[in-house]
Protein backbone atom coordinates (compact mmCIF):
# COMPACT_ATOMS: atom_id res chain seq x y z
CA UNK A 1 0.00 0.00 0.00
CA UNK A 2 1.50 3.34 -1.01
CA UNK A 3 1.78 6.23 1.44
CA UNK A 4 -1.10 8.21 -0.08
CA UNK A 5 -3.55 5.30 0.15
CA UNK A 6 -2.35 4.45 3.65
CA UNK A 7 -2.99 8.00 4.85
CA UNK A 8 -6.44 7.99 3.21
CA UNK A 9 -7.25 4.64 4.83
CA UNK A 10 -6.28 6.00 8.25
CA UNK A 11 -8.57 9.00 7.71
CA UNK A 12 -11.38 6.66 6.72
CA UNK A 13 -10.87 4.67 9.91
CA UNK A 14 -11.02 7.85 12.01
CA UNK A 15 -14.25 8.98 10.32
CA UNK A 16 -15.83 5.56 10.79
CA UNK A 17 -14.84 5.71 14.46
CA UNK A 18 -16.42 9.15 14.75
CA UNK A 19 -19.80 8.09 13.29
CA UNK A 20 -20.05 4.76 15.17
CA UNK A 21 -23.47 3.07 15.04
CA UNK A 22 -24.84 0.00 16.83
CA UNK A 23 -25.86 -3.28 15.21
CA UNK A 24 -28.77 -2.96 12.81
CA UNK A 25 -28.48 0.83 12.58
CA UNK A 26 -25.34 1.20 10.47
CA UNK A 27 -27.02 3.74 8.16
CA UNK A 28 -24.43 6.53 8.06
CA UNK A 29 -21.58 4.02 8.13
CA UNK A 30 -22.93 2.16 5.12
CA UNK A 31 -23.69 5.34 3.16
CA UNK A 32 -20.23 6.73 3.88
CA UNK A 33 -18.45 3.57 2.72
CA UNK A 34 -20.58 3.13 -0.40
CA UNK A 35 -19.94 6.73 -1.43
CA UNK A 36 -16.18 6.39 -0.88
CA UNK A 37 -15.89 3.18 -2.87
CA UNK A 38 -17.99 4.62 -5.70
CA UNK A 39 -15.71 7.67 -5.85
CA UNK A 40 -12.35 5.95 -5.39
CA UNK A 41 -12.73 2.66 -7.30
CA UNK A 42 -14.23 1.16 -10.45
CA UNK A 43 -15.86 -1.69 -8.56
CA UNK A 44 -19.49 -2.65 -8.98
CA UNK A 45 -21.51 -1.86 -5.85
CA UNK A 46 -24.56 -3.84 -4.80
CA UNK A 47 -26.81 -2.44 -2.08
CA UNK A 48 -28.48 -5.22 -0.09
CA UNK A 49 -30.44 -3.04 2.32
CA UNK A 50 -28.73 -3.32 5.68
CA UNK A 51 -25.39 -4.19 4.08
CA UNK A 52 -23.60 -4.05 0.75
CA UNK A 53 -20.80 -5.54 -1.25
CA UNK A 54 -18.43 -4.29 -3.94
CA UNK A 55 -17.45 -6.63 -6.77
CA UNK A 56 -14.31 -6.96 -8.86
CA UNK A 57 -14.57 -9.14 -11.97
CA UNK A 58 -11.27 -10.66 -13.08
CA UNK A 59 -10.31 -11.20 -16.71
CA UNK A 60 -8.72 -14.51 -15.73
CA UNK A 61 -10.71 -17.33 -17.41
CA UNK A 62 -9.82 -19.62 -14.49
CA UNK A 63 -10.82 -17.14 -11.80
CA UNK A 64 -12.38 -18.41 -8.58
CA UNK A 65 -14.98 -16.49 -6.62
CA UNK A 66 -13.58 -15.32 -3.30
CA UNK A 67 -15.11 -13.19 -0.56
CA UNK A 68 -13.40 -10.81 1.84
CA UNK A 69 -15.57 -9.56 4.69
CA UNK A 70 -15.49 -6.77 7.26
CA UNK A 71 -18.05 -5.81 9.92
CA UNK A 72 -19.49 -2.30 10.29
CA UNK A 73 -21.21 -2.13 13.69
CA UNK A 74 -20.03 -0.49 16.88
CA UNK A 75 -20.77 -1.34 20.51
CA UNK A 76 -23.26 0.25 22.95
CA UNK A 77 -20.39 1.64 25.06
CA UNK A 78 -19.08 5.14 25.75
CA UNK A 79 -15.98 6.03 23.76
CA UNK A 80 -12.55 6.82 25.14
CA UNK A 81 -12.22 10.52 25.87
CA UNK A 82 -9.37 12.65 24.63
CA UNK A 83 -8.98 11.48 21.02
CA UNK A 84 -9.73 13.91 18.22
CA UNK A 85 -11.99 11.46 16.39
CA UNK A 86 -14.07 10.45 19.44
CA UNK A 87 -17.50 9.04 18.57
CA UNK A 88 -20.19 11.69 18.22
CA UNK A 89 -22.91 9.09 18.85
CA UNK A 90 -23.83 9.10 22.56
CA UNK A 91 -23.23 5.73 24.19
CA UNK A 92 -21.84 4.11 21.02
CA UNK A 93 -18.23 3.48 20.04
CA UNK A 94 -15.96 1.25 17.99
CA UNK A 95 -14.35 -0.46 20.98
CA UNK A 96 -14.11 -3.76 19.07
CA UNK A 97 -12.19 -2.37 16.11
CA UNK A 98 -14.74 -2.71 13.35
CA UNK A 99 -13.83 0.77 12.12
CA UNK A 100 -10.38 -0.62 11.40
CA UNK A 101 -11.78 -3.70 9.67
CA UNK A 102 -13.85 -1.58 7.28
CA UNK A 103 -11.03 0.88 6.64
CA UNK A 104 -8.68 -1.97 5.70
CA UNK A 105 -11.28 -3.48 3.36
CA UNK A 106 -11.79 -0.05 1.78
CA UNK A 107 -8.03 0.16 1.18
CA UNK A 108 -8.05 -3.32 -0.37
CA UNK A 109 -10.93 -2.29 -2.64
CA UNK A 110 -8.78 0.58 -3.89
CA UNK A 111 -5.74 -1.61 -4.51
CA UNK A 112 -7.61 -4.36 -6.34
CA UNK A 113 -9.46 -1.79 -8.43
CA UNK A 114 -6.14 -0.26 -9.50
CA UNK A 115 -3.93 -3.33 -9.78
CA UNK A 116 -6.37 -6.12 -10.60
CA UNK A 117 -6.57 -9.67 -9.22
CA UNK A 118 -6.50 -13.21 -10.52
CA UNK A 119 -9.88 -14.03 -8.95
CA UNK A 120 -13.33 -12.50 -8.84
CA UNK A 121 -13.59 -10.72 -5.50
CA UNK A 122 -16.65 -9.88 -3.40
CA UNK A 123 -15.82 -7.21 -0.80
CA UNK A 124 -18.53 -7.70 1.82
CA UNK A 125 -19.39 -4.98 4.34
CA UNK A 126 -21.48 -6.77 6.96
CA UNK A 127 -23.93 -5.28 9.42
CA UNK A 128 -24.91 -6.70 12.81
CA UNK A 129 -21.83 -8.75 13.70
CA UNK A 130 -22.26 -8.19 17.43
CA UNK A 131 -25.80 -9.58 17.37
CA UNK A 132 -25.19 -12.37 14.85
CA UNK A 133 -28.01 -11.19 12.58
CA UNK A 134 -25.70 -9.77 9.95
CA UNK A 135 -23.56 -12.85 9.61
CA UNK A 136 -26.56 -15.07 8.95
CA UNK A 137 -27.89 -12.71 6.25
CA UNK A 138 -24.57 -12.09 4.51
CA UNK A 139 -23.72 -15.80 4.51
CA UNK A 140 -26.48 -16.34 1.94
CA UNK A 141 -24.20 -14.64 -0.60
CA UNK A 142 -21.80 -17.61 -0.44
CA UNK A 143 -24.29 -19.94 -2.10
CA UNK A 144 -25.88 -17.24 -4.23
CA UNK A 145 -22.56 -16.31 -5.89
CA UNK A 146 -20.87 -19.69 -5.53
CA UNK A 147 -18.05 -18.22 -3.45
CA UNK A 148 -15.20 -20.72 -3.12
CA UNK A 149 -13.22 -19.06 -0.32
CA UNK A 150 -14.15 -16.54 2.36
CA UNK A 151 -11.59 -14.44 4.24
CA UNK A 152 -11.73 -12.16 7.26
CA UNK A 153 -9.41 -11.07 10.05
CA UNK A 154 -9.52 -9.54 13.51
CA UNK A 155 -7.16 -7.11 15.14
CA UNK A 156 -5.35 -8.68 18.08
CA UNK A 157 -3.21 -6.90 20.65
CA UNK A 158 0.08 -8.26 21.92
CA UNK A 159 1.73 -8.96 18.57
CA UNK A 160 4.29 -6.92 16.67
CA UNK A 161 2.81 -4.27 14.39
CA UNK A 162 2.45 -5.48 10.82
CA UNK A 163 2.35 -9.15 11.80
CA UNK A 164 -0.23 -11.47 10.25
CA UNK A 165 -1.02 -14.40 12.54
CA UNK A 166 -2.51 -17.65 11.28
CA UNK A 167 -3.66 -20.62 13.36
CA UNK A 168 -4.66 -24.12 12.37
CA UNK A 169 -8.02 -25.19 13.77
CA UNK A 170 -10.32 -23.13 15.96
CA UNK A 171 -9.44 -19.46 16.46
CA UNK A 172 -12.52 -18.13 18.27
CA UNK A 173 -14.78 -19.83 20.79
CA UNK A 174 -18.36 -20.75 20.14
CA UNK A 175 -20.60 -18.41 22.12
CA UNK A 176 -24.18 -18.40 23.36
CA UNK A 177 -26.25 -16.00 25.40
CA UNK A 178 -28.40 -17.63 28.12
CA UNK A 179 -31.21 -15.55 29.60
CA UNK A 180 -32.77 -16.81 32.83
CA UNK A 181 -36.20 -15.33 33.58
CA UNK A 182 -37.83 -15.87 36.96
CA UNK A 183 -41.35 -14.86 37.89
CA UNK A 184 -42.74 -14.72 41.40
CA UNK A 185 -45.15 -12.32 43.10
CA UNK A 186 -44.46 -8.69 43.99
CA UNK A 187 -45.42 -7.37 47.38
CA UNK A 188 -45.05 -4.34 49.58
CA UNK A 189 -41.57 -4.17 51.11
CA UNK A 190 -43.12 -4.28 54.58
CA UNK A 191 -44.78 -7.64 53.85
CA UNK A 192 -42.26 -9.79 51.93
CA UNK A 193 -44.05 -12.91 53.14
CA UNK A 194 -46.94 -12.02 50.80
CA UNK A 195 -44.75 -12.28 47.72
CA UNK A 196 -42.11 -14.41 46.05
CA UNK A 197 -38.89 -12.53 45.35
CA UNK A 198 -36.72 -13.93 42.51
CA UNK A 199 -33.59 -12.12 43.74
CA UNK A 200 -32.39 -14.96 45.96
CA UNK A 201 -32.80 -17.75 43.40
CA UNK A 202 -31.10 -15.62 40.75
CA UNK A 203 -28.22 -14.86 43.11
CA UNK A 204 -27.75 -18.57 43.88
CA UNK A 205 -27.83 -19.41 40.17
CA UNK A 206 -25.24 -16.76 39.34
CA UNK A 207 -22.95 -18.03 42.09
CA UNK A 208 -23.45 -21.59 40.82
CA UNK A 209 -22.47 -20.53 37.29
CA UNK A 210 -19.26 -19.00 38.63
CA UNK A 211 -18.52 -22.14 40.61
CA UNK A 212 -18.97 -24.29 37.50
CA UNK A 213 -16.62 -22.08 35.51
CA UNK A 214 -13.93 -22.18 38.19
CA UNK A 215 -14.14 -25.87 39.07
CA UNK A 216 -15.90 -28.41 36.87
CA UNK A 217 -15.28 -26.56 33.59
CA UNK A 218 -12.07 -24.79 34.51
CA UNK A 219 -10.15 -23.99 31.32
CA UNK A 220 -12.83 -25.57 29.13
CA UNK A 221 -15.69 -23.07 29.34
CA UNK A 222 -16.59 -19.58 30.48
CA UNK A 223 -19.85 -18.43 32.06
CA UNK A 224 -19.74 -14.64 32.19
CA UNK A 225 -22.59 -12.77 33.86
CA UNK A 226 -23.32 -9.79 31.59
CA UNK A 227 -26.61 -8.57 33.03
CA UNK A 228 -28.84 -8.71 36.10
CA UNK A 229 -32.25 -7.09 36.37
CA UNK A 230 -34.42 -7.51 39.45
CA UNK A 231 -36.46 -4.65 40.81
CA UNK A 232 -35.02 -1.17 41.18
CA UNK A 233 -34.70 1.83 43.44
CA UNK A 234 -38.27 1.54 44.66
CA UNK A 235 -37.76 0.91 48.36
CA UNK A 236 -41.42 0.38 49.09
CA UNK A 237 -41.83 -2.53 46.67
CA UNK A 238 -40.41 -6.05 46.51
CA UNK A 239 -39.95 -7.28 42.93
CA UNK A 240 -41.84 -10.19 41.45
CA UNK A 241 -39.75 -10.58 38.28
CA UNK A 242 -36.06 -10.84 37.57
CA UNK A 243 -33.58 -12.02 35.00
CA UNK A 244 -29.92 -12.88 34.66
CA UNK A 245 -28.00 -12.88 31.38
CA UNK A 246 -24.98 -15.16 31.06
CA UNK A 247 -22.63 -15.55 28.10
CA UNK A 248 -21.36 -19.11 27.65
CA UNK A 249 -18.14 -19.73 25.69
CA UNK A 250 -16.08 -22.79 24.77
CA UNK A 251 -14.09 -24.17 21.86
CA UNK A 252 -16.47 -27.15 21.88
CA UNK A 253 -20.22 -26.74 21.39
CA UNK A 254 -20.80 -29.94 23.36
CA UNK A 255 -19.19 -28.26 26.39
CA UNK A 256 -21.49 -25.26 26.01
CA UNK A 257 -24.46 -27.63 25.91
CA UNK A 258 -23.19 -29.32 29.07
CA UNK A 259 -22.62 -26.17 31.14
CA UNK A 260 -25.94 -24.73 29.95
CA UNK A 261 -27.70 -27.92 31.10
CA UNK A 262 -25.99 -27.69 34.49
CA UNK A 263 -26.95 -24.03 34.96
CA UNK A 264 -30.57 -24.43 33.85
CA UNK A 265 -31.06 -27.52 36.04
CA UNK A 266 -29.77 -25.61 39.06
CA UNK A 267 -31.95 -22.59 38.20
CA UNK A 268 -35.07 -24.77 38.01
CA UNK A 269 -34.35 -26.23 41.43
CA UNK A 270 -33.59 -22.82 42.96
CA UNK A 271 -36.78 -21.35 41.48
CA UNK A 272 -38.89 -24.23 42.76
CA UNK A 273 -37.52 -23.79 46.27
CA UNK A 274 -38.60 -20.13 46.22
CA UNK A 275 -42.01 -20.77 44.63
CA UNK A 276 -41.06 -19.18 41.30
CA UNK A 277 -41.67 -19.89 37.64
CA UNK A 278 -38.55 -20.01 35.48
CA UNK A 279 -38.03 -19.88 31.71
CA UNK A 280 -34.93 -19.71 29.54
CA UNK A 281 -34.05 -17.97 26.29
CA UNK A 282 -31.05 -18.17 23.99
CA UNK A 283 -29.65 -15.15 22.20
CA UNK A 284 -26.59 -14.32 20.10
CA UNK A 285 -25.83 -17.94 19.30
CA UNK A 286 -22.50 -18.28 17.47
CA UNK A 287 -21.57 -21.90 16.57
Which residues fall in each region the model found?
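Active-site beta-loop-alpha junctions enriched in small/polar residues
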Residues: 21, 71-73, 128, 156, ...
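Structural signature of FAD isoalloxazine-binding scaffolds in flavoprotein oxidoreductases
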Residues: 69, 104, 152, 241
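Metal-dependent amide/peptide-bond hydrolase catalytic core
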Residues: 203-287
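Short, small-residue-enriched loops and turns at beta-alpha junctions
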Residues: 19-24, 75, 131, 232-235, ...
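Histidine/acidic-residue-rich, glycine-tolerant segments that coordinate divalent metal ions
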Residues: 75, 83-93, 99-100, 115-228, ...
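Acidic/His- and Gly-rich active-site-bordering loop/insert found
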Residues: 1-94, 103, 111-119
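N-terminal hydrophobic/helix-forming segments and targeting peptides
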Residues: 1-20, 31, 35-38, 110, ...
Amino acid sequence: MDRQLLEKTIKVRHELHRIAEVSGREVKTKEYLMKLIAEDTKLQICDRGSWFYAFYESDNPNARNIGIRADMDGLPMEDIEGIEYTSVTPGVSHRCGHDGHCAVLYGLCCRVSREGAGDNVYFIFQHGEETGIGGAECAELIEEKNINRMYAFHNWSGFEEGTVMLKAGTVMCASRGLRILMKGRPSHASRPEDGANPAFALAKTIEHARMLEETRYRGDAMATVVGINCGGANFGMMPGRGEADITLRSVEESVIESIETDITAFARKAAEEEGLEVTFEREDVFP
